């Protein structure tokens, strides 16, 4: 699927054809969902460990959908907004809040509202506020 001017369209057979149809200087976002899905499938099948998609790389909903349908069911999130986005689209996914700096409200909401149970810390002292916020829920 190619996206032109934020409108989903399958009417362009290639990126070149889409670019040729443009007569103005606005940015164009092209997403190749099949390519993303096939790459996700390759990683999910051949990597020996658990494969996570880092939402920070590209949080576009069509990218998340392609990763999910390609077999990547778990996501590395770095903010409460990313938690909300993935939860809304892929509610059965396991999320991993890997960013080492997290606001207490982000911890509390991720744990209490969205059921996150996987958090990363970069030092044992950072675990104290994490544990406190999780215990209050």
Which positions does each model-derived feature cover?
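A charged N-terminal "starter" segment
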Residues: 1-137
């Amino acid at each position: 699927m190619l996206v032109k001017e934020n409108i989903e369209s399958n009417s362009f057979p290639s990126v070149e054809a889409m670019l040729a149809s443009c007569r103005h200087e606005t940015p164009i976002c092209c997403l190749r969902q099949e390519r993303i899905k096939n790459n996700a499938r390759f990683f999910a099948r051949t990597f020996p460990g658990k494969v996570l998609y880092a939402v920070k790389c590209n949080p576009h909903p069509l990218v998340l959908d392609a990763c999910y349908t390609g077999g990547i069911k778990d996501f590395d999130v770095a903010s409460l907004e990313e938690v909300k986005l993935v939860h809304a689209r892929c509610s059965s996914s396991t999320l991993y809040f890997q960013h080492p700096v997290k606001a207490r409200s982000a911890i509390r909401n991720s744990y209490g509202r969205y059921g996150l149970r996987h958090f990363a810390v970069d030092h044992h002292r950072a675990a104290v506020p994490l544990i406190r916020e999780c215990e209050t829920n």
